Curated annotation (Swiss-Prot):
Catalyzes the conversion of 1-hydroxy-2-methyl-2-(E)-butenyl 4-diphosphate (HMBPP) into a mixture of isopentenyl diphosphate (IPP) and dimethylallyl diphosphate (DMAPP). Acts in the terminal step of the DOXP/MEP pathway for isoprenoid precursor biosynthesis. This is 4-hydroxy-3-methylbut-2-enyl diphosphate reductase 2. Belongs to the IspH family. Binds 1 [4Fe-4S] cluster per subunit. Pathway: Isoprenoid biosynthesis; dimethylallyl diphosphate biosynthesis; dimethylallyl diphosphate from (2E)-4-hydroxy-3-methylbutenyl diphosphate: step 1/1; Isoprenoid biosynthesis; isopentenyl diphosphate biosynthesis via DXP pathway; isopentenyl diphosphate from 1-deoxy-D-xylulose 5-phosphate: step 6/6. Its cofactor is [4Fe-4S] cluster. One of its GO terms (biological process) is isopentenyl diphosphate biosynthetic process, methylerythritol 4-phosphate pathway. The active site is at E133. It is an enzyme of class 1 (oxidoreductase). InterPro entries: LytB/IspH.
Length: 320
């Protein structure tokens, strides 16, 4: 039997679930425990197939729009990404028992946008079109009240009605560096533009990207556990590439690994997006352990202790 080649795995810390994702998953599981199946969920509760399939097996039914739900007294949960105002209004018109699992840090962005609108400012939203979080934020205000800025070129081209009456907010899962570049353009062009008191890009996005920045330059390849439609996971892969990692791949499960990409490597970086469970990280490490003689090191960029309680209606004291 041939001896296994040595491989050092460098685990990024923090990685995986953030407080908003834990809250969203707990919301669906608590609703199932309290009210029984089915529990309807508009859109994937978080962007991870393993999580969605696990909840589906417990009795959650996932839909893209409320029109797909029959008249029911079952709970209807809104995903962590947030929804346009029209969605809860529609739910109310059908007498649905709706539960909002929007991440509190996304809700913070919604509130910021509403305050700017109330003050009569033109609002710019830095984000990626069609992402459900962006759709939800745009949908907090009347059509045309918010302009989407996706790139520094968009920021350069934007022509406001009043350059002294502008504000910006951002999607919570963006690239720190890309967003900083866009904000720099906006502040140079419009020195009086109002921004968030605290960065809209969330702590989890920031910390996970910081960990990848520390690890990517010292590894031969980087694996990011996450779904293709997960914005924060895709950003982690991009950060690894920018930091000089020649092989940076996004995978959902160990079965997705293309082993030809890892031939001859000596050091592998491993992280997970904010919606990816640790069990998949362990699964991937197990797959590498079958082929390599592993040693493991953890590199930390931050400590996390954030916690968001589930919506009030699901808390034990709700009936008191």
């Amino acid at each position: 039997m041939l001896a296994k080649s040595p491989l050092k795995i460098v685990l990024c810390s923090p990685r995986g679930f953030c407080a908003g994702v834990v809250r969203a998953i707990d919301t669906v599981e608590r609703a199932l425990a309290l009210y029984g199946a089915p529990v309807y969920v508009r859109h994937e509760i978080v962007h991870n197939k393993y999580v969605v399939d696990s909840l589906r097996a417990k009795g959650a039914i996932f839909v893209e729009e409320l029109e797909e739900i029959p008249d029911t007294k079952a709970p209807v949960v809104f995903s962590a990404h947030g929804v346009p105002k029209s969605v809860p209004e529609h739910a109310l018109s059908r007498n649905f028992f709706s539960i909002d699992a929007t991440c509190p840090l996304v809700t913070k962005v919604h509130r910021e946008a509403a305050i700017h609108f109330k003050r009569g400012r033109e609002i710019l939203l830095i984000g990626h079109s069609h992402h459900p979080e962006v759709v939800g934020t745009l949908g907090q205000l009347p059509a045309g009240a918010v302009t989407l800025i996706e790139t520094a070129a968009d920021a350069e081209a934007y022509q406001p009605k009043d350059p002294n009456n502008l504000a910006f907010v951002t999607q919570t899962t963006l690239s720190i560096d890309d967003t900083a570049g866009i904000v720099t353009v906006l502040r140079e062009r419009f020195p009086n533009i109002s921004g968030p008191h605290k960065e809209d890009i969330c702590y989890a996005t920031t910390n996970r990207q910081a960990a990848v920045k520390k690890v990517a330059p010292v590894v031969d390849a980087m694996i990011v556990v996450g779904a293709p439609n997960s914005s924060n996971s895709q950003r982690l892969r991009e950060v690894a590439e920018r930091e000089g990692c020649k092989v940076a791949v996004l995978v959902q499960r160990a079965s997705d690994l293309d082993w030809s990409q890892f031939e001859g490597i000596k050091v592998l970086g491993l992280t997970a997006g904010a919606s990816a469970p640790e069990v998949i990280v362990e699964e991937i490490m197990g797959a590498f352990a079958e082929r390599f003689d592993l040693s493991v090191e953890t590199v930390s960029a931050a400590e996390e202790n954030e916690f968001f309680p589930v919506p009030r209606v699901l808390r034990p004291d709700a009936a008191e």
